Regions:
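Active-site metal-coordination/substrate-binding segment of hydrolases
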Residues: 86-184, 219-222, 335, 343-353, ...
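Acidic-enriched catalytic cores of C-N bond-cleaving enzymes acting on peptides and small amides
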Residues: 216-220, 239-269, 288-363, 397-399
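A short beta-alpha structural unit
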Residues: 38, 42, 271-273, 283-284, ...
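Acidic/His- and Gly-rich active-site-bordering loop/insert found
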Residues: 22-125
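His/Asp/Glu-rich mid-to-C-terminal helical/loop segments that flank catalytic regions of hydrolases
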Residues: 178, 243-260, 289-290, 336-343, ...
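Zn-dependent metallopeptidase/amidohydrolase metal-coordination segment
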Residues: 33, 354, 361-377, 381, ...
Length: 506
């Protein structure tokens, strides 16, 4: 399958792998990466169903001269010996994941468990025919395989390809720390912009509040109040934009209405996912407060909202009207506890990074509010690049739960990957990028979202890590596409970085 794309003759001598390059021009690097990627697209590999692709990678890494371990989780750990003369160099890990998000355009018949991806190639892009492409992270794994074949001078290299990154990071979580502790550097290949080097990411934790409800009848007039027009967005990517949170906005409005007369809550819902800023929320109330007075209170709340969030969320508005179909109201103490909790929980940015003034360090998102006849549930999702900040938020949440009579379930904490103030690997890679791009500087950033590197950092805090990747667009959608022009530069960036590391001391 690969014969037309192999440009090295591998010779084995005393446990060493020696490479004799026949041709190493850019075109052949490109075709090798695409060939490796195309082989992956033929194997169905949705998260949780990685046996076939794991078995394939076990065989493939062995074919290029690696000693391969397949662990119980189906992670692949593949060790390539140092090139001759580079045995004293530190070990570098090249890391990616083998699973993908499988989605299809409406009307496209596609079984993610049995159908291969139909790879398409134009002059500019790699795409798929009607489905997601799986470039996240298939192209990263292909780059790893190519770099391990082409780099002539290198220290010991270990490829780690994990399972289930897209759903639960269970591969990274269950990876034996021994595979990380004998390495000095780790290059994660799961980013989506060749020009950006990521050097830190946020940890997070699921905080789930709940409280049982009692119900009673009420004869007061019933109304519907809703918040609409907010932009919402991903709570990692957009939390720093200063956007409003519909659930908290409506809770504050109900709190203001309580000052004008009796309010009885029938229902209160909002949000769709804990990691999404909720753009809408809705409540059904019964109240003795007159309609004109309610309209006035809501107008005041709109004014207050715009003074805080108007620049980022200019289209916010309240919708108000009579409610035709209502149920029984919840108890007064339960209503007070719920509104208190929703207004006490701090949403949005908590702290900015001390290393990068324009980057968020710590935030929290009040993502989902659900209510049925017998229970109310609140999903709260803090993130931070500093683990101790998450600990503080958890402690505060536990106190709020105690004060308001809510139960709190604290999920497994995803650790932060905290940016190093001095990174040898980032310095080397930045210099290589600049030399290969006419003196241009690589963008260096920490992201306010989770990466597998967070789990690696927790298991070996001494690991010097970066995350890079081939430029891609529309990941996790049928519009996903990979920029072909970025494939070779990415490979050469990795290869030259490995060559320079070969001259580092352990």
């Amino acid at each position: 399958m690969y014969g037309s794309f192999f440009f090295y003759v591998l010779q084995y001598e005393a446990g060493k792998v020696r490479r004799h390059s026949i041709m190493t021009d850019d075109a052949k690097i490109l075709e090798t990466v695409i060939a490796e990627f195309e082989a992956l697209t033929r194997i169905p590999r949705p998260s949780g169903h990685e046996r076939a692709v794991s078995d394939y990678l076990k065989k493939r890494f062995a074919e290029i001269g690696c000693t391969v371990t397949q662990d119980e989780a189906l992670n692949i750990i593949a060790d390539l010996p140092a090139a001759e003369g580079c045995e004293s160099a530190p070990r570098t890990i090249l890391q990616g994941h083998m699973d993908m998000v499988c989605v299809a355009e409406p009307g496209v018949i596609y079984d993610s468990l049995s159908d291969p991806i139909k790879l398409q190639r134009t002059e500019e892009f790699l795409t798929a025919d009607g489905t997601s492409l799986g470039g996240d992270d298939g192209i990263g794994v292909a780059e790893i395989l190519t770099a391990m074949q082409y780099t002539e001078a290198h220290g010991p290299i270990r490829a780690i390809v994990t399972v289930d990154e897209e759903q639960g990071m269970t591969g990274a979580r269950h990876l034996d720390a021994a595979h990380l502790k004998d390495a000095r550097f780790l290059i994660n290949c799961d980013s989506e912009d060749y020009h950006i080097m990521t050097v830190g990411s946020a940890g997070s934790v699921n905080l789930d509040f709940s409280r049982m409800l009692t119900r009673r009848e009420s004869n007061l007039p019933a109304y519907r109040i809703a918040v609409a027009g907010l932009l919402g967005g991903h709570s990692g990517e957009r939390i720093g934009d200063g956007r409003g949170n519909a659930i908290r906005t409506l809770a504050l409005a109900l709190q203001s209405l309580e000052k004008h007369g009796k309010i009885e809550l029938v229902s209160f819902t909002g949000g769709t996912a804990r990691n999404a800023i909720p753009p809408t929320a809705e409540a059904i109330i019964r109240t003795e407060v007159g309609e004109r007075e309610i309209v006035g209170v809501l107008a005041g709340e709109e004014k207050r909202f715009r003074s805080i969030y108007g620049a980022a969320d200019p289209a916010m508005k309240f919708a108000f009207g009579a409610a035709e179909h209502t149920g029984r109201v919840i108890g007064a103490a339960e209503q007070h506890a719920l509104i208190s909790l929703l207004t006490l929980l701090r949403t949005g940015v908590h702290d900015m990074s001390h290393l990068h003034a324009d980057k968020v360090e710590t935030s929290a998102n009040l993502g989902v509010l659900r209510m049925d006849d017998s229970e109310v549930q609140v999903q709260y999702f803090p993130r931070s690049s500093v683990n101790e900040r998450l600990d503080e938020i958890i402690a505060a949440a536990q106190t709020m739960a105690e004060l308001t009579g809510f139960s709190l379930v604290v999920g497994t904490q995803s650790p932060a990957w905290r940016e190093r103030e001095e990174s040898t690997l980032a310095k080397i890679m930045g210099e290589v990028y600049s030399a290969q791009n006419g003196g241009a500087q690589m963008t260096v950033e920490s992201i306010h979202a989770g990466l597998e590197t967070s789990w690696h950092a927790a298991k070996n805090p001494a690991l010097d890590m970066v995350s890079i990747g081939v430029t891609a667009h529309g990941i996790h959608t049928p519009e996903e596409r990979i920029e072909i022009a970025a494939i070779v530069p990415e490979a050469k960036l990795m290869m030259e970085t490995l060559r320079r590391i070969a001259h580092e001391k352990k």
